[in-house]
Amino acid sequence: MAMKARLESVLNVGLRIPSIMLLEVLYRWDVSSFFQKIQRSSLNNNPVFQYKYIALYLHYVGYILSLVLLTLPRQHLVQLYLYVLTALLLFAGHQLSRDYVRGELDSGYEGPLYLEPLSMNRFTTALIGQVVVCTLCSCVMQTRQIWLFSAHLLPLVARLCLVPLETIVFINRFAMIFTGLEVLYFIASNLLVPYNLAKTAYRELVQVVEVYGLLALGMSLWNQLVLPVLFMCFWLVLFALQIYTYFSTRDQPPSRERLLFLFLTSIAECCSTPYSLLGLVFTVSFVALGVLTLCKFYLQGYRAFMNDNAMHRGMTEGITLLILAVQTGLIELQVIHRAFLLSIILFIVVASILQSMLEIADPIVLALGASRDKSLWKHFRAVSLCLFLLVFPAYMAYMICQFFRMDFWLLIIISSSILTSLQVLGTLLIYVLFMVEEFRKAPVENMDEVIYYVNGTYRLLEFLVAVCVVAYGVSETLFGEWTVMGSTIILVHSYYNVWLRAQLGWQSFLLRRDAVHKIQSMPTASTLQLQQHNDICSICFQDMKSAVITPCSHFFHAACLKKWLYVQETCPLCHGQLKSQLQPTSSPGTPTQGTPAANQNPREVEQEQRQPQVELNTEEGIRAEEMKTSAEQKLGMDLLPGSLNTQPKECDLVAEGSAGTASNLKGDDYYDDDDVSTSDVNCAS
């Protein structure tokens, strides 16, 4: 079943290539120049060529026929090709019969065949050929009525029966007329088939559009026709024919420089029409996809195909080629100018492929450096690919400077190559830092700061390169030749590579600066608070020997919280906005008014603030406290969840000017010690 599906896929593509070939030929065929040549030749008196408009209509009929062949379903397309093959076989049988009759007329021998060796050889050859033609026709048409295709055997039978040669000529004509009538009958019997197919196709298209819409219809046709593979195969066939035509007309093999020129000119010849240009676009897309797939396989092996990234499909390179070709009018240029411009466009495509390779390799290399993988082969593959991406773009920029005169387009290519090399250099430096930290026994302090400075350095260099490109483009526009395309490229380059990069870098700097200020403004937890908290950092899941306390009373490592604040301004646990909660404090360990104390639940503080404050150094305070305590004991109220768990204490409350008795209160203290003065409360533990 898999083999059958593959064969059907190959047939689906291969049988549609002639339709695009026909479109290519019709586009290249200049009808007006064709009729001018006919008028200057002897064919001008031919009545067929007197009706020029009929030929023009046939030209448009060819377009319709090619579109029908392109969109016809595979089953009907196979049947159509079988019918065409049968017609060609019948024509071959007619040619064999005509050649045999001419040979017999030239010899003039009318006697028995076995007496003349030459006549016997001609007869045997013609008989074998006609039998093969009849057999193939019956097999192709899947019928056992082989006599339908054996009309051209009549001249052979007549010659075997010693019929005169003049009569054999008429018999051959009768065989030709009989075969032609068969073909006409077959065409007439299937005359309504195209109409029925068009009617069915229209009804299905209307149903699909009503249910799913035009977009779904376009996607369905795209998948059924396999247009990218179809245009790629068409362009490869066209390119192979161009190379074959060149080498078939040359006796000596070309030199190395000539081969490069031949390669560029052949590509330029094969993109002179919109159809061949689309074929080149899809071919470049598939080549880019193959290169990126090999890059993934080289880095990760078969694991790369498990988590395939939809972003690296090679479509970016193909779309880049198409946009540049359309904007520069590539198909309207001469072959030499087209080859020169195409070389520059291909350099841009190669630079885009290198950038995509870097996007694939960068996270893999950094993850490999941060992990503890000891496989030398993995590290060798990652580092070797990075070294290639470091050296090759620089070499390509050097070659461009050597062979081309500098202009804005070439400066964009060179800047892209330099940026790729800079990014690879930054990736390698970070990888080296990770490996140094791995081999050291103690971790490197402020490693994130070092990595940030490395990234910031090459980002700054990228920004400077982009600014230089924009400055050169503006100067060339002001003092050189002004074009709409050049100005558009400058604006797009200025927005994406200058303004957005500057804005992103400035935002990153502000986030880091605000994070440092926030960490400095937060109180530091004391040793007692850390012991009472007795928890790990929720970011790194490690024990805390030192920590800072957020306004929402959560404990974190200062370094971990700073890294978190580099990205967002919320608490990692409660996701509250730290920016709005931060307020200036009087001292690092003292909570301000409205701010909960360290290691204290905000809900408890809020409930305490709602309750009236009670003075305990008066008789009313003691009575209120006793009433509150007795009420809590009767109702069985527990402490609020999240309050501090302290050891039970036995307190003697002594009030001045009263004869109150001592009450032994055993249990958890509801209030902190700060709420009761030491002169009024004596606690005996």
Swiss-Prot record:
Residues 620-631 have a biased composition (Basic and acidic residues). It is found in: Membrane. It is a multi-pass membrane protein. A zinc finger (RING-type) spans 537-575. Residues 583-602 have a biased composition (Low complexity). Pfam families: TRC8_N, zf-RING_2. Residues 582-685 are annotated as: Disordered. Keywords: Membrane, Metal-binding, Transmembrane, Transmembrane helix, Zinc, Zinc-finger. InterPro entries: HRD1_E3_ubiq-ligases, RNF145_RING-H2, TRC8_N_dom, Znf_RING, Znf_RING-CH, Znf_RING/FYVE/PHD. GO terms for biological process: ERAD pathway; hemopoiesis; myeloid cell development; proteasome-mediated ubiquitin-dependent protein catabolic process. The chain crosses the membrane at residues 53-73, 77-97, 123-143, 151-171, 174-194, 225-245, 275-295, 316-336, 340-360, 384-404, 410-430, 460-480, 482-502. GO terms for cellular component: endomembrane system; membrane. GO terms for molecular function: ubiquitin protein ligase activity; zinc ion binding. PANTHER family: RING FINGER PROTEIN 145, RING ZINC FINGER PROTEIN. This is RING finger protein 145. It comes from Danio rerio (Zebrafish). The gene is rnf145.
